[in-house]
Amino acid sequence: MLATKMSVTFCFLLMLTTVMLPTEAKTVAGRTACTQHTSCDTPGAKYCCQNSDCCGGSEHFCASFGQCMRSF
């Protein structure tokens, strides 16, 4: 009986961890990208949170990894 309870508890914790990890990682990645937001005057790669953060008007968009990219 004790082995069954421990097995059920272990499975529950494993399931909970599996569900929570991707969400937490995404939040951390989103925060990292947004704290690295750069202005148009800074040379080099531009980091962003949304499309309007990118310089160059509608030709540029904010990629999912938080960097401005030029659309082709």
Swiss-Prot record:
Contains 4 disulfide bonds. The cysteine framework is XI (C-C-CC-CC-C-C). Expressed by the venom duct. The keyword Acetylation does not apply. It comes from Terebra anilis. It comes from the Eukaryota. GO terms for molecular function: toxin activity. It is found in: Secreted. Belongs to the teretoxin H (TH) superfamily. One of its GO terms (cellular component) is extracellular region. This is Teretoxin Tan11.1. Keywords: Disulfide bond, Secreted, Signal, Toxin. Its main location: secreted. Residues 22-31 form a propeptide. Residues 1-21 form the signal peptide.
